[in-house]
Amino acid sequence: MKLNKWVSVGVATITLSMLSVSTPALASGDGQSTQTSDSTENQTQTQTSNHTNQSHSQWQKNLTGEAHTTIAHRGASGYAPEHTFNAYDKSHKELGASYIEIDLQRTKDGHLVAMHDETVDRTTNGHGRVEDYTLAELKKLDAGSWFNKQHPDLAKSEYNNAKVPTLDEILSRYGKNANYYIETKSPDVYPGMENQLIQSLNKHGMLTDQSLKNGHVIVQSFSEPSLQKMKQLNPNIPLIRLLDKGELPFQSEADLKRIKSYAVGVGPEYTDLNEKNTKHLKDLGFLIHPFTVNEEADMQRLNDYGIDGVFTNYADKYLSLIHIS
């Protein structure tokens, strides 16, 4: 059965539906019949509301304790060059996002670095694949000037010649004062990157029972094998299965059960979510963190559906919305 065909109907809802059909006939009788109908319908509505509230209270909650978590997509990438300390500092220190989101690639000499693409062309003045650069060579590239050229209204001189950070540098800079939402990007290109990620997180004290309990680290991936490997290496790390655009509607019950066996949540492309499939995912015990949500109207609509947070380039927009709500 496909996700976009699920319908969840409670007993209380069926009762209310039946009463609403019979009410007009009752209303045409004497006042006592109308009063009885109104009383019964109000009681049924209360039962329905209580049933819904009880169901919602059992839904999976963010480990940070927040009703809605704000994931700074590649840092504050709407305001600063993505995956640079400029973007991370702004999202963490200035905007107050819940998580710094980090995409991982690996250099020729084995260093995990923060970069979305497998090539350096889009976000630096270099050319070629990350895996063909040593860390020293990668550090010579300018990872910020492109942003000033594309966004002259947001340009800052400090962005010029920004550097590509390593995972270790990021963890050293923010330590346990930040939360990290880390993606194993292109794990097929970088075999063994899961082991390296575990080693780095251990080195920086991010895999203690307390850190994991409080959601200081979440690992995400589009790759099921990569997440399953992470689960084998450390079964206590919260994992999120990312679902590309158009992928969510084709997940069967068996698919979702399999995902739930290793992941605490899913990160679907946000336009694939609707009220029904959001509720079904929540009823199955998933956290739901859709990507990449940059418009306030979409943020509000998704919150109304029942999601638990968003990936966004504009953490300030989402934070303002959830603080007002």
Please annotate each region the language model reported:
Residues 3-12, 17-325:
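Phosphate-group recognition and catalysis centered on beta-loop-alpha active-site segments
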